Amino acid sequence: MNRLYEHTTKRCTSSQIDAPLWAEVAAHAEAHQLGDVLGAAVNCFETWSVRLRKPGLLSRLTGSGDHDTEHRTVVVVAPRYVVVAVEGKRRGVHVRSARLDGVSLSDPSELHRLVRETAASAGRFGRLPPDDFGMSVTALWSGAREAASFYIGVSDDSEGRALLDEFHSAVTRAKST
């Protein structure tokens, strides 16, 4: 298996988010006028991600690799917004949010399958994409001037799939109202 991270995802409530991270999310919501997203949370998930190997040479030379050996991602889905908070020892806490009706989701597993099939048909297996499980979320994130993609990795189990399914449903609901 060619995974970059070991992900462990579990459902949580906004009251189960530890106090320092909860305060960061609440401050972000207030600064960006999102309302009480923690109180209005429809879904809340937490994923612990442990890096399985160090970043590649180029990433280490340029400093673009993940500096934390493990980090936590909390996804809070409210009726109109999604808030994503990532916390790591070296990176600190980073909180971003987006309107659900402006979110585009891509299932990397489909792209992953196509790349693997193309590599197999060409007889090239050396540089295949990682087998991590998750979803790429493209949106106009808080404070940004243009849309950007953010990958949310989750565990490849019932909890991880529930996060992806419920997030997809929330985006669909927001776009249809």
Describe each model-derived feature in a short phrase.
Residues 1-76:
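Anionic N-terminal interaction surfaces
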Residues 5, 9, 13, 66, ...:
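Generic preference for well-ordered secondary structure
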Residues 23, 27, 59-60, 113, ...:
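Polar/charged alpha-helical tracts
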Residues 45-134, 174:
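Phosphoinositide-binding peripheral membrane targeting modules
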Residues 125-162:
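Canonical phosphoinositide-binding patch of PH/PH-like domains
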Residues 155-177:
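Pleckstrin homology
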